[in-house]
Amino acid sequence: EELLLNDLCPDMKYCCEDLLMKKQVSFLPGDAETVSFPTESTLITSCSALQWFESPENFFERCNTLLNNQGYFAFSTFGKENMKEIRELTGNGLPYRSREELEVALSPHFDILYSEEELIPLSFEDPIKVLYHLKQTGVNGLSTQSSPTGKQENDLCSSDNNSKNNFKNNLPQQQWTRRDLQLFCERYTQEFTQGASVSLT
């Protein structure tokens, strides 16, 4: 048995050095939509990456050709409700697909054995803490061109990683003025306060 790890960033290999010490484990950097993966695989799995892909639909078809007849494809990704609060206030965000859309895209290539969607609302002391959380948790699909006052212009398992232009860890406040940030916080507090905190989906 062999395990092949993949990430868009080559430096991620340093985060799994302990695994790579085993001879049956290897690391292949590159774009998961185009990199050459081995055929006749028994399992392809992806965690929180498909939302960055140019075409998840094409990737699903590709995975089908890479798996053996008894192979499995399992992944988790984010749905349409992800960071909806930020999207409503800035008009910016990734084009997330719904669970139903993903199932439709999977159906021509796989028998869907399991599908589930979960909403996990988070609570923060104030909107500044929300922005800090987004910065600390990595890429988020927010552009430095977002306006704080502008309006808007899931787990699956099947039987048988990116939108490269958006792959940046830039929070919008990098080009916001102090007034912009103040307006964002005021609107966020007004629209998304729950009890003594503000929410983020």
Question: Which functions belong to the PLM regions below?
Answer:
Residues 33-44:
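A short acidic, Gly/Pro-enriched loop at the edge of an enzyme's catalytic core
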Residues 57-72:
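A short glycine-rich, Lys/Arg-flanked "PGG" loop and its adjoining helix->strand segment in the class I
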Residues 72-101:
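Conserved class I S-adenosyl-L-methionine
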